Each structure stands twice: as C-alpha cells, then as structure tokens.
C-alpha cells in the first residue's frame, strides 16, 4: 500500500481543521491506518510529528492574524485552536522567538493593513488570505 496519499489526506485535514481539537486517533482514522503507524509514518514523511505539525500550523495562522487582523492576542489564541493563552504564548515564543504581542508590535510599526475583527468573526480566519488577494 502506498502510504503517502493517505498521509497527505491527514496533512490536508490538519490544514483545513487546525482551529478545532484534533488528536492522533482522528488523524489516523483520516489516513486509514493505526495510530502508531500513522505517527511514525507522518514524521518520516514530513519531518514533524502530526501534533508538532498541527502546533506549527496554528502558530503560522496566528502570525497571519497578528499581522493583519484587529483582534486581541487572546481572541487569536482561541481562533487558531489553542485552549490556553499561556500555552499559546509560550509555544509562540519558542517557535517564533518573540511573544505574540512583540510580534504584532513589530509588524504594526511597518504600517501593515488590519482587517476589522468583526469581519473575521463573520467570515472566519481561514478566509483572510483569499479575501486580501481580491482587495488588491
């Protein structure tokens, strides 16, 4: 059995559903293999465990929102799927090298555009990139 297409399904599932709770059981089910085989194979294929990939995806999305959205760090934390502001801030700091607030402040100093928070809550944070492409 060629496992890569199955792993890709789980990878895509993470990309689409990063904002909700995802566990190894669900991801392995999407890939159609056992949990342990899935975890080992995913890491071999992508260089990260599924949970580390999910965390990085959430942090990348948070970076997007911090640069472009007029939302608080707490709102962004919960929008991208973290359940604790403390764990979000510490993971963000570890992966990005600065706190979410410092990251936002650095980007705000460059004068980037901000999307109103009410728009994001209406459309969802996943639409931000697609909508901005249509604005220009």
Residue ranges and their predicted role:
Residues 1-35, 44, 49, 61-136:
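Alpha-helical bundle regulatory/interaction domains
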Residues 52, 56:
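Short, basic-rich loop-to-helix N-cap that marks the start of a DNA-contacting helix
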């Amino acid at each position: 059995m060629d496992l890569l297409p199955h792993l890709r399904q789980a990878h895509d599932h993470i990309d689409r559903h990063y904002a909700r709770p995802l566990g190894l059981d669900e991801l392995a089910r999407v890939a159609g293999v056992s949990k342990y085989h899935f975890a080992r194979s995913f890491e071999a294929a992508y260089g990260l465990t599924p949970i580390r990939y999910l965390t990085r995806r959430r942090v990348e999305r948070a970076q997007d929102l911090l640069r472009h959205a007029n939302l608080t760090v707490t709102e962004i934390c919960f929008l991208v799927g973290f359940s604790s502001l403390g764990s979000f801030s510490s993971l963000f700091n570890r992966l990005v090298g600065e706190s979410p607030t410092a990251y936002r402040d650095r980007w705000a100093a460059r004068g980037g555009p901000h999307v109103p928070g009410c728009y994001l809550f209406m459309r969802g944070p996943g639409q931000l990139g697609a909508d901005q492409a249509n604005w220009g």
